[in-house]
Amino acid sequence: MTVFEKHASLIMLLEKYGFSLVGENLNGERVYLKDRRNLDFSDPCKAFPFLSDRVDHAGCIAIDMGYHDTMFASSELAKTLQERVDRSVANGLKKVYIGSPYSLAFQVGDPVFIYRKFTGTQGRPGYKSCITSYCLVTRIERIKTRGRELMSYEQYRRIIGNKSVFTDQELLEKYIISDDLTLIELLYYGFFGAGNNVNWVWLKNNDCWPGTHPLNFRYSREQFDRILQEGNVNVENVIVD
C-alpha cells in the first residue's frame, strides 16, 4: 500500500494494523507492507485479519437480529430484508457488546462467532437464526456485579465510545438498572456473506450446538474450523503459522 507522508492519520492507522514502511516510490509515496509470514499475534490489531495457528478453541455471542443488523452491517443474509439504524458502530472494526452474563466461556485473545438470533414472527427460526461473522475478543470489563459499581458511568461510557449499537440514553439506563453488567470489546475479523451463513439447523445436526447459552459455548479447534468452512471461509487464509 502506498501513501504520502502528509497523510499522517492514515499512516498511523496502517501502523496500528501491522503495516511496516519498506521503502519509497520515486514520487515520494511511502510503501507499506504487511507480511503474513511475520505477524505480531500479541496485538490483535497488528495481526488483523489473521488468527494464530495456536488457537485451540472459540466462543460465541448471540445478538438479537435488530441489534445485529446495525452492529454488523456487512454481515448480510440472503433473501432477508435487514433493517439497520445509521450509527457509526456499523462502519468501525471495533464493536462493543454489553450484557449481563453469569459466566463466559472465552477470554481476551479468543475468537468468537457472532450468532444472529431471529426474533421475528415469519418463517422458521431454525433456518433464520445463524452464525454470520467471527471476531476476536480484545477486552472484557466487569462494570457492575450484584448491584455494586466496579466502574463509574463516565469510565464505562469512555470505553464504549462510538462502538456500541445503543444510544446514550440506553447506555445510561443499562448502567442504572442492571445489577450485573459486562462490556466485551470485539475486533470484527470477518463475515460469511449472503448465502453462506451457518444456520441453527446445521449447527444442531453437526454437533455444533452445545445446548446451553451461547455465551457458554466452547467450540473446539475442529468445530471452529468446520464452522468457518461451512461459511465458505478458506481456513488457511485466516489461521496462519
Q: Model-found features: residue ranges?
A:
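Active-site-adjacent bridging/hinge elements
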Residues: 81-89
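Short alpha-helix capping/helix-loop boundary micro-motifs
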Residues: 92-102
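Short coil-to-beta transition motif at edge beta-strands of beta-rich domains
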Residues: 102-122
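Residue-level detector of short, conserved catalytic/binding motifs and their immediate flanks
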Residues: 110, 133, 184
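Histidine- and/or cysteine-centered catalytic micro-motif in compact active-site loops
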Residues: 117-119, 136-140
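Short coil-to-beta-strand transition motifs
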Residues: 124-136
